[in-house]
């Protein structure tokens, strides 16, 4: 390609003057017929077809954008001629429009990586309309949909399909050195992330659409879900050489990335770029902790009967509680906590810790709360799932899901489905309105018990599409 570049830049042996013209300007290029002929169907037909220009020394073509078209033609010679006055999204969309005009293949994988501002959304729709439509292109449209865009400008069938896509979610699980991503029908993995070390922790950053995972060496990786690239990685600075330094827990709360290490350290970072905000050094067992999105706090349970509570925003110690001393609890809202005492679930106010009531049944797994349904769900050793009324603290229903222990429960991003896994890695999807089983799937017995569901799109855009 370097030789071709020299031919163009030094105007060697050119045999055609090509005039590229749009409504604003004309650009003259000295080119070579054989180079154009072998580069795309448009010039192949123009140069040997039944056209009056076939033998002309000068040919004019009328295009939508002369500058972009000139860049595309220069690229036939291996010249990558970017236009600094064009933002990336506009440069690539205009380039892809030129590709279509020339009969060239539009690189869909590159198109799917684009983030387009509201002023470019109509152009994006035009480019997508040139392609064979697929779900990936529909997701691209939803991701770039301006919140002030009039949905009525789109066809009814197209909006219906976007609604379908907006309500899809994906399920993530880990297996030793890999992260497997399934669609919500749990067919074969649609994506697999391979890693050199055992993956020890996992969470999803919905704000930035990234999978965050940590490994045995204490390194944290931020993996962009749509571009399939590592955005950054963070090395752990080991403070205790006698202990392993692997990451045992990760969480995203608002714009903060919280990571807990085996060596007794909690770091809080900016989730966008990994910039360190502060470090909390735990005096004893780092496994006795809880990172809580409802209270925006970190709880640490020590062996002296106290629970320290830090603000995630400031890193300051804001409470010291003595009511409970184990991690088997969930915060239901910013003022409500459920925790274990003698195998019973106790509901209490936070931070006063005044008890509201007791769920009198032996449980050993953290409960799952569906606030929109006002239900508390608890999985049992015998495969039974109990559903409690959050306000009345009465048992609504018990349903036998499996014959073996339930190890994890989560729900879909919009709350309409419940995903429950047992120790044999059999997963069942339930309707969260009536708790009836929709379907069952096995996703490999040697996956660990980390199960996440992720929404592919922002809640505001999902609501906008489904409000019609």
From Swiss-Prot:
This is Putative BTB/POZ domain and WD-repeat protein R154. Residues 14-85 form the BTB domain. Pfam families: BTB, WD40. WD repeats lie at residues 194-233, 354-398, 401-440. CDD domains: BTB_POZ_ZBTB_KLHL-like (cd18186). Keywords: Repeat, WD repeat. Gene3D superfamilies: Potassium Channel Kv1.1, Chain A (3.30.710.10), YVTN repeat-like/Quinoprotein amine dehydrogenase (2.130.10.10). One of its GO terms (molecular function) is RNA binding.
